[in-house]
Amino acid sequence: MDDRYPGIFIPRLNKIQNRLPDVPFVSQWQEVPQDLICNAEDRECTDTTKHCQCFHVVKVPLNALVELVLVDVRPTRNADSDPPGVPPPTHIHHPFHLHGYYFNLVAQQQNPRNVTPSDIFNMVETGDIPLNLYRSPSKDTVGIPINGFVVLRFVADNPGPWFFHCHLGNHAVSKLYF
């Protein structure tokens, strides 16, 4: 959701809505304007009065261990303050798919209480969320539980640009990918 447009869903990863370049990145990456490319480290998108949109690229060193924590932030509905016509929150799983790799699903939970994504990131970092690091399932697509999260791990041993996106058609069209 975007605070400037109540009731309108604007999907974002790391507070960035992706914008594809006019040329295919896989084959013509040299032609992508550098000022279009960004990631969460070089573009701070914390101001909700601004719509942060760019070609969201995360550069990962070869053979690095990558850990992704994906959190489904479920919008809540307040009948007293929501403008008329605001639709109720959706109740769907987000199936995320990674091209070029298989990842290990090391944790998957519904949010047992109302905690923020930052709380979940901190709990993963401090070990308060147990990770299944042995015999965890290997996948290329995972469903994020409604109002829940997943923790994924893989080794970046297949160099090149790879697409990571929500597999729901309307979310892909609305740019829920990087």
Could you describe each region identified by the protein language model?
Residues 1-178:
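Copper-binding active sites and cupredoxin-like electron-transfer domains
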